[in-house]
Amino acid sequence: MITRFTSNSSGTGSPQPLRRRLLFGVASSAALAACGGGSDAAAPSPAPSPAPTPPPPPPPSSVWAAVDAAVDKAAPSFGNGLTVEVAIPAGVVYSRSSGGYTSQTRNPIASATKWVTGSTILRLVQQGTLTLATRTGDLLVDRNGAPWSGPIGQITLSDLLSFTSGLEGDVDEATATSITLAEAVLRIHDSQSKPGVLAPPKARYWYGATHLRVAGRMAEVATGKSWQQIFDAALRVPLGWDSASIYSLGGPNPALDGGDGGIRCSGEEYMRFLVMLLRKGLYGGARLISENLIATQRADAFTANTVIVKSPYQKFTPDPMYHYGLCNFRECGNPGNAGACDVDPTLRFSSPGALGFGPWIDVYGNYAACVMTRQPQQGNTEPSEVLKQTLAPLIRSALTSNPAVIRPLP
């Protein structure tokens, strides 16, 4: 039985009240437990320190500052304005315009057309309609209806796309816009089948329109369609180009090489084409050209004995002596050595136009870029070439900061 004690008024030796003694015991036990005295329980671990916050990416203005400065400095050399765009496989990461020219401006692109024409024909090779070994004599006939024969009938599609077919680069009679492509190619045959005119395949490189007119006519015969219909199905529609993007104002003798201005298109459309090539033939989830064909397109088409008769780079001092693939130049430090060029870290593929429109793909930089413009004077390509050389290392440097995509491409 618990007896309850109460204190008396004298404060003499009365026992401590039970409640006070119980509270004291509980408090003492709690204090000992808190101090760990006599306990096997481990003390709680301190909370881990938060991971350091990574620094934010630099703002776009600082990422592209050097590129902006180079474009702005060059702008006065472009009488009709210019736009420069850069794309990685995911899409466009840089765009800068001046002088009223934008990436939506639709203009003729001159010899930048050659790359598109060659890729259109490679699309037919991809589909099995043609092969790179298909010969002129397999598809073309002369004015008497007989297949092309003799050396001129042995020219392959690959020879034509590399401008090493042995044909002269230009035949004036074939350039009239009022005739058909079929008639133009008959005139080429009339001219080039004469004794002593044709060179052996791979003996010479002659930059010009003749090769692509013949290749385009082979495509028309193989498909039974006009060139514009071939281009529409092969690339224009898959790349989402506008129906206004046509060859030579839609005439019956399209300038497949870029003469008469070549294709009229916007820079934004051309960037889609470049990104397709950068992705090695993929666009919009579809395989337009195989990786093997893209590799063939980029490979050096010259032999050790190929002589450069005519090239747009001959007007530069020094002449870089760039070699050619299938409708694109191979820009590198040692173009005469195909193996060294292939592994050159500065290797670029390009197809510059006489109006200054200058597209290129930097293989090891993994980007595509284009100087978009229409110079007032045809042949004024130097400002675009100089700007390309200036921008190439600056773009690579900017891309190390992983800039954001500003215009995604499918």
Residue ranges and their predicted role:
Residues 108-112, 124-168, 217, 221-260, ...:
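Active-site helix/loop module of the DD-peptidase/beta-lactamase fold
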Residues 160-163, 211-218, 259-283, 294, ...:
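Active-site-proximal alpha-helical segments within enzyme catalytic domains
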Residues 378-410:
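Short, gly/Ser/Thr-rich active-site loops of penicillin-recognizing serine hydrolases
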Residues 106, 171-271:
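Catalytic-site signature segments of enzymes, centered on catalytic residues
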Residues 36-44:
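Bacterial lipoprotein signal-peptidase II cleavage site
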Residues 1-18, 24-34:
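N-terminal secretory signal peptides
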Residues 71-103, 240, 358-362, 367-372:
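A short, well-structured edge-of-sheet supersecondary motif
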Residues 243-261, 265-268, 299-370:
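Active-site Gly/Thr loop motif
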